[in-house]
Amino acid sequence: MIFGELRRLYLIIGVMLSYGLDELIPKTRLTLPLRLGRNLLFWMPNNHAQRMLGERLRLALQELGPVWIKFGQMLSTRRDLFPPAIADQLAMLQDRVQPFDGALARAHIERSMGQPLETWFDDFQQEPLASASIAQVHTARLKNGQEVVIKVIRPDILPMIKADMRLMYRLASWVPHLLPDGRRLRPVEVVLEYEKTLLDELNLLREAANAIQLRRNFDGSPMLYIPEVYPDYCSETMMVMERIYGVPVNDVAALEKQGTNMKLLAERGVQVFFTQVFRDSFFHGDMHPGNIFVSFEHPENPQYIGIDCGIVGSLNKEDKRYLAENFIAFFNRDYRKVAELHVDSGWVPPDTNVEDFEFAIRTVCEPIFEKPLAEISFGHVLLNLFNTARRFNMEVQPQLVLLQKTLLYIEGVGRQLYPQLDLWKTAKPFLEEWIKDQMGLPAILRALKEKAPYWAEKLPELPELVYDGFKQHRLLQKSVDRLTVEMRVHHVRQSQSRFLFGIGATLLLIGTFLMTQGADEGSLPAWLMAAGTVSWIIGWKRTA
């Protein structure tokens, strides 16, 4: 470690100990050096002993800064790593930090655009509209009068991220050596997944492309509106998009005051999620309340507004089909089908004992279904499923973890808006219709239509391909026949060699025995030994 890393590590240890996080260290023989080391750092007492452990962990991560805040937010979705009380506290982490100087933002914009800011924008507000750990947002107008927001990456964030990521990897590499269950948790993979997410958020060109894709997917939809992005003004560290006005989705009082149809709004949240996942295979992966607003227009026919598209997820056709069938099998309590789907999809190893897996799923999930369907959480069903599957060596599926996190957000918001929301009743027709569309006659006809141009292109080559196929088959058959003959000859030679080896060994033993007995047989022992040697040589040559 270089001096800077050691200093940062000392600071991190100091913050963690000041919140008493040494309580998270398990009391095992492997962790004895860590616990002894804690006792040596007597000048770093627990200053928050009156608080619960989960709250202390959340406060410590907030104090450590942006990289650790976002890491805690990601860990809140991995409920196989922590008890529910701690995971719930991590989910409360707020991605809000002190803004950086607006003059720095102005200088960054001018550097990115290559000209004075006034060349492109009017009414630039140096005071930020919002500030988060990765970037902050300023308002302005384009020269045509269009109100926009300008998102600017923090100027000092990249060196901080790189330094803290190096420390995270180092700490993660220690976990398997310190915890009995450390290898199963795959700590290095967790950090790797986090680093990828974080680096994606640092590239605003990626976020701009995501927003453009989502806007196109929901163009003209009454359910969701994505603000327009202006690509000509965007770079890796700066993004310009349309300014929107709406009610924060978690401001229930304001929504009710304007007469919003809360039942329809809650149901549309579910429909938006399943449309993104199953129709578009492209979903907003950070749909927490801070990124979702409700339009002021048409409260009786409410429309969501989505921003901050830095994190998105996608599922391939196989994952979508297995996921949809899993949901339906789950709510039909067909646990055998759920277990088989996991094996068929490759999410768990092919040698998994299906009966044991089915029993484990039944044990965990059957108590959930004692509740009325309207009270059952899709997200927690998925969470229990993944946690059970991990005990059967399910590989970490980043796209499914992100989907589960997003589903929990959607459920939480939906039930906050309309507590009687029946998620299953809203989602089941959508899932059943999607499966029927994917597996019925329309799906076959659609596949034929998609493949038709390719087949038409290859049709003139078909006679030649058939001829080449027959020719290759003939050549292969000749090779097989020749190989069969060679194997038979080799087998005969091996049999003869074994026979000659046996004769040679017998003659040598008899000749040696007669010679050691001193029998008066003249030159017979020598002749026997010579014959045995010749037999060995002939047998050896046949094997060569």
From Swiss-Prot:
Where does it localize?
Cell inner membrane
| Entry EC no(s) | 2.7.-.-
Identify the catalytic residues. Answer: D286
Q: Where does ATP bind?
A: L129, A130, S131, A132, S133, I134, A135, Q136, V137, K151
Record flagged with keyword rRNA processing: no
Q: Which UniProt keywords apply?
A: ATP-binding, Cell inner membrane, Cell membrane, Kinase, Membrane, Nucleotide-binding, Transferase, Transmembrane, Transmembrane helix, Ubiquinone biosynthesis
Taking the first listed entry, what is the main subcellular location of this protein, grouped into a coarse class?
A: membrane
Record has Cell cycle as a keyword: no
Which pathway does the protein contribute to?
A: Cofactor biosynthesis; ubiquinone biosynthesis [regulation]
Top-rank taxon, per record: Bacteria
Its transmembrane ranges are 1-21, 499-519, 520-540
Q: Which residues form the signal peptide?
A: none
Q: Name one GO biological process term.
A: regulation of ubiquinone biosynthetic process
Q: How does it sit in the membrane?
A: Multi-pass membrane protein
Concerning SUPFAM superfamilies, the annotation shows: Protein kinase-like (PK-like)
Q: What class of enzyme is it?
A: transferase
- One Gene Ontology MF term: protein kinase activity
**One CC-aspect GO term:** plasma membrane
Q: Which InterPro entries match?
A: ABC1_dom, Kinase-like_dom_sf, UbiB, UbiB_bact, UbiB_kinase
The Protein kinase domain sits at: 123-500
Say what the protein does: Is probably a protein kinase regulator of UbiI activity which is involved in aerobic coenzyme Q (ubiquinone) biosynthesis.
Q: Which HAMAP family match?
A: UbiB (MF_00414)
Which family, according to the similarity comment? Belongs to the ABC1 family. UbiB subfamily.
Protein name from the UniProt record: Probable protein kinase UbiB
Query: Which organism's genome codes for this protein?
Result: Sodalis glossinidius (strain morsitans)
